Regions:
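Predominantly soluble domains enriched in secretory-pathway, periplasmic, or organellar proteins
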Residues: 4, 11-385
Length: 385
């Protein structure tokens, strides 16, 4: 009888542990292999690969699980089923995409291009291009770099902001009319738009400028520039801002300089930089832990994750993640906050970090030069950017 009780207890413990481990997958585009790896993060192995176009970069998933892959080496999007892990189709585009973004209601996909000043809007029900809008004057000579970067949707889905990096402007496009509602002149090319927590301002994170690099604050109602905040850099440090994030209370905005190693901290009330920190080389993406206490900063020219204590505004640790010095754009904290996933793109590994210990616990081989990944958590597709 005693053996039976023990056996029953072991069975119950096994069953509980099985229930406590929901399905968790990473969907990883490989720019070097022209495919997508489907990774079971619980088993820590690749289940299958899916073919894509050339140089697949990012993925945008609808809530139902339809995924759009932007291929940066061919004029097409690859559409996948994120539940069955199958390729559905390809969507032919008028140019080569740089980035994509879904509308808040998931009904429309905005496509910004690297080799054309155009913005396409795609109906996600039919996968047909509804309209393609010219957003600026095309360059007369060969243009170095991507002409556009990340598109940004307003909360109500009525407008899309698109960066015109040829003419250093942001274009506001009305979705219903397909017309340009506003043109905002910037001191340099824009990389990303972050809405303030109260929605009143847009923080335009700019790249290289004559004066260095800056964050331009834009009134989200009038589309007028409120202030251009210059970022203090070390002597000789190139300016090339990339991404940022707000603290949970909205009092500070941390922004990363990919051109060097500076992470600048802006007081959002004063609209001024109050402190700078030194991260790894190519500081790119700050990801906040679930409890709001730390930023884990991904670098694009280094082999460490920089951990910043938000309250103290200090770097508390550098976590080595391999030998390669190129990391993918994005990371993911598990819902319980215990683990953080990122990719070392030169080592071709997905890295799992224990958040409390701030140490690497495992590495999962993935495809070559993966620069982005998406997550399937149960039936959900949470953001990794």
């Amino acid at each position: 009888m005693k053996k039976q009780v023990i056996a029953l207890m072991l069975f119950v413990l096994y069953a509980v542990s099985a229930v406590a481990a929901p399905d968790r997958f990473a969907i990883v585009p490989s720019e070097g292999d022209n495919n997508i790896s489907i990774v079971d993060l619980n088993a820590e192995k690749v289940l299958k690969t899916l073919p894509t176009g050339k140089t697949p970069h990012a993925i945008a998933f609808t809530r139902e699980g339809k995924g759009y892959v932007n291929n940066r080496g061919s004029k097409e999007l690859t559409v996948i089923d994120g539940n069955k892990f199958e390729v559905l189709k390809s969507i032919v585009l008028p140019a080569t995409s740089f980035q994509i973004a879904l509308s808040p209601d998931n009904k429309t996909l905005a496509v910004a291009y690297k080799d054309a000043l155009k913005l396409s809007l795609i109906d996600t029900a039919t996968d047909a291009i509804k309209i393609t809008i010219a957003v600026g004057k095309e360059p007369e000579a060969a243009f170095k770099g991507a002409m556009m970067k990340h598109p940004y949707w307003t909360k109500d889905g009525a407008y899309v902001y698109a960066s015109d990096n040829v003419n250093n402007t942001i274009i506001k496009v009305g979705v219903k009319t397909g017309s340009i509602a506003a043109t905002i002149n910037l001191p340099g090319p824009n990389h990303y738009l972050h809405p303030s927590p109260d929605g009143k301002l847009l923080y335009a994170v700019n790249e290289a400028e004559k004066a260095g690099t800056s964050v331009t604050l834009i009134d989200s109602v009038t589309d007028r520039i409120v202030k251009d905040v210059q970022i203090p850099l070390e002597a000789g440090e190139p300016g090339l801002l990339h991404h940022g994030d707000f603290t949970k209370d909205g009092k500070y905005f941390f922004v990363c300089n990919e051109g060097g190693r500076t992470v600048a901290i802006m007081d959002t009330a004063k609209q001024d930089i109050v402190k700078t920190l030194k991260a790894g080389m190519g500081a790119g993406h700050p990801g906040m832990t679930r409890d709001g206490n730390y930023f884990f900063v991904i670098q694009h020219k280094d082999n460490v994750i920089t951990v910043i204590d938000i309250a103290k505004q200090e770097v508390v640790k550098s976590i080595p993640v391999g030998t390669g010095k190129k990391q993918a754009h994005g990371g993911y904290f598990t819902p319980d906050g215990k683990f953080y996933y990122m990719i070392n793109a030169e080592d071709n590994n997905m890295v799992k970090i224990d958040v409390s210990k701030m140490d690497v616990v495992s590495k999962i081989p993935v495809g070559k030069s993966a620069m982005f990944f998406s997550i399937k958590e149960g039936n959900d597709f949470p953001s990794t950017e």
